[in-house]
From Swiss-Prot:
Extent of the signal sequence: none
Keywords, alphabetical: Nucleus, Phosphoprotein
InterPro entries the record matches: UPF0688
Origin: domain of life: Eukaryota
Pfam families membership: UPF0688
Name of the protein in question: UPF0688 protein C1orf174 homolog
Source species taxonomy: Eukaryota, Metazoa, Chordata, Craniata, Vertebrata
Biased composition (Basic and acidic residues): 49-78
UniProt modified residues of type Phosphoserine: 180
Length: 230
């Protein structure tokens, strides 16, 4: 009976232990699952945040890229507008310049006589005639120059006529009218002022005297008058 009771007690204790172990294992499993679920939620949230950041960065990069592309599209137009406009060179002008250059090159070649041909004898008289014509006008011009110089020396302009002309010009001006408020010229009262400037200053006949001497002379004259009256 006792052995049965002991075995029954051992079995019950083993059952209790098994139950407690199973409950502990279940609790630990629940903790593990809860921790894993928390980790998964954290990872999911972090992954969502990372994806959001990446998408925002991509959006910003795309925006910046689009803005740069638009600016690059606009820049060439502004560069083209800022460049100075060069007038297009007409092709006919280039052809005309080339033709004139070819003609200038061909003219001296045509002037040179071909080989084996002698110069015509008619050129020598023409050269002589040209020399004669060129020397004749030069001699005539040389003969006219001394005649002009002698005529200029033989006709000097008198100085008095120049002075009279200047006086007449002064009198014919607008500011010398009788009704105007301008002062009259000095030459009308005193003659020609230019001739008066060369004259020496008028010398005083009496020497300069002091004020005392002048007063003495004045009192003496008064005394003489009183004596004459008395």
């Amino acid at each position: 009976m006792r052995s049965r009771k002991l075995t029954g007690g051992v079995r019950s204790s083993a059952r209790l232990r098994a139950r407690s172990y199973s409950s502990a294992s279940l609790a630990s499993a629940r903790d593990v699952t809860s921790s894993t679920s928390a980790k998964t939620t954290c990872l999911a949230s972090s992954s969502h945040k990372a994806t959001d950041r990446r998408t925002s960065k991509k959006f910003k990069y795309d925006k910046g890229h689009l803005v740069k592309a638009e600016l690059q599209k606009l820049d060439p137009k502004s560069d083209i507008s800022s460049l100075p406009k060069v007038a297009p060179v007409a092709p006919c002008e280039n052809k005309f310049a080339e033709d004139s250059a070819e003609a200038a090159v061909s003219v001296p070649e045509s002037r040179e006589p071909p080989q084996g041909c002698s110069t015509p004898a008619s050129e020598e008289p023409s050269v002589k005639a040209e020399n004669g014509l060129s020397t004749e006008p030069s001699s005539a011009a040389a003969a006219q120059e001394p005649d002009d110089s002698s005529a200029g020396q033989a006709e000097p302009v008198p100085r008095t006529e120049e002075v009279r002309a200047s006086v007449l010009q002064m009198d014919s001006s607008i500011f010398l009218d009788d009704d105007s408020n301008q002062p009259m010229p000095v030459s009308r009262f005193f003659g020609n002022v230019e001739l008066m400037q060369d004259l020496p200053p008028a010398s005083s006949s009496y020497p300069s005297m002091s004020r005392r001497e002048f007063r003495k002379m004045h009192f003496r004259a008064k005394d003489d008058e009183d004596d004459a009256e008395g």
